[in-house]
């Protein structure tokens, strides 16, 4: 009688075999070679199964009580060598697995034993690998040369980062309002810190280039971590750190990410005080096979087929079907109970809506988007910084709010309507007051009232008069005398008109 143990059968193929790839902390070194048991959808008759079991080369009995592991390993190795000499394709051996009430025929792939290590071949391989690393470093840095004419940006909480010309990284606080599709702009009222701007050439590469009489090596080196290869550039010369008294430094890692459409900063962290690490994901390095991520290792499949008699019907391997049928019978019983108790329309327990805050989730009731039912949703006005553009360091002209022609041109006056003023976040009453003051101050000359956006998103109304300074001064003096006379007549104190230049500023920012 045969007995089958999947774990022992998998381990007997190559006892002590090592992982073919590099070291990975998440992998178990004792799991190689890897096997995976797969249950095939096809079936095999009992006659064919016993024929395969009897016709294969005798190796050892599945009853481990009658043989030792050492004898089984020696017999298996001898048979494998004899079979592999005449066969180019994979070879299998068959074992019977019993899982009452069924039996399965499992085909186990026979793996070749690893060859003995050759010291000379290993030394040649190491030398070839060193040359390949040097070539890959130069090739990878050449692929990244296009980054020297561009900038990458990354935002993380309070701080934002810019990586420009592939050699300078700046940390700054961005303005709170950034238009869609525009890079972050530094707030001029906050400080910025340079994390690195001077590439540091690896000492090993510089020494090797000097010994060989070659040109200066690229300011990057290739590093290997497990099966993954990536370029590393170290930047120095950053802003002096107030905690350590030394310059800030940063290490930039370039990783190949197949399928990406553009370069992107993955993340930035401060690993130690004023020492940073940044990862750049780029598809450029994928053009060199040396930087491609390793292929996922697949386990060797142990395929098991169900053994059947011709007269028996194949049972279903899907164990979820009876469970689903049992679950489907539960609401039916509840419906029957509800019908007996007189409930005309019992509700399915599995679809019972949940009441959250007075709202039935899943009830498919149309809810109002406003604060009160039956009213349209409220439209909030855009913030003041909504109209800001990418050039936030300078003033920006928005629109002419009101204008008046001189008396020679007819003296016509044009003012935006109340709807347009509200769209610009302006109060019509404030604009009306400003327009009246500008009309009186300009007199017979033409004038205009403009809306200007200041750095930071604030807006300001500015008035301009088409007159010389002498004429404007006379008009101001005349207007001043008229106001003084009116104040004396009424006995009230009124605000005097402040003398200024041709450009008039009105302190109405808070009322806009």
UniProtKB/Swiss-Prot annotation:
Belongs to the OS-9 family. Glycans are attached at residue 118. A motif (Prevents secretion from ER) lies at residues 509-512. This is Protein OS-9 homolog. GO terms for cellular component: endoplasmic reticulum lumen; endoplasmic reticulum membrane. Disulfide bonds join 151-164, 241-274, 256-286. Residues 149-288 form the MRH domain. PANTHER family: ENDOPLASMIC RETICULUM LECTIN 1, OS-9-RELATED.
